């Protein structure tokens, strides 16, 4: 169970890093928001899913 928690936590950190870099780039480009709106929303949805998964898995690890 610990390895699943660690992999999920790593995925959360990786997605967070990608969103921190990617979202400002999307907003800075001239037509980036209209073209990449779905990608940004997908990334945010995955981020929320991973936050809840880490919270649930944390109760099993500790």
Swiss-Prot record:
The GO biological-process annotations, alphabetized, read as: photosynthesis; photosystem II stabilization
- The entry's protein name is Photosystem II reaction center protein Z
Q: Where are the transmembrane segments?
A: 8-28, 41-61
State the species of origin.
Answer: Oltmannsiellopsis viridis
Localization recorded for this chain is: Plastid, Chloroplast thylakoid membrane
Record GO cellular component, one term: chloroplast thylakoid membrane
| Function description | May control the interaction of photosystem II (PSII) cores with the light-harvesting antenna, regulates electron flow through the 2 photosystem reaction centers. PSII is a light-driven water plastoquinone oxidoreductase, using light energy to abstract electrons from H(2)O, generating a proton gradient subsequently used for ATP formation.
Family named by the database record: Belongs to the PsbZ family.
List UniProt keywords, sorted A-Z: Chloroplast, Membrane, Photosynthesis, Photosystem II, Plastid, Reaction center, Thylakoid, Transmembrane, Transmembrane helix
> Between which residues do disulfide bridges form?
none
Please give the NCBIfam families that the UniProt record associates with this protein: PS_II_psbZ
A single Pfam family it belongs to is Ycf9
């Amino acid at each position: 169970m610990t390895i699943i928690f660690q992999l999920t936590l790593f995925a959360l950190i990786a997605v967070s890093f990608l969103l921190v870099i990617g979202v400002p780039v999307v907003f800075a480009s001239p037509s980036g928001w209209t073209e990449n709106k779905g990608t940004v929303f997908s990334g945010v949805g995955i981020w929320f899913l991973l936050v809840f998964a880490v919270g649930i898995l944390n109760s099993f690890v500790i």
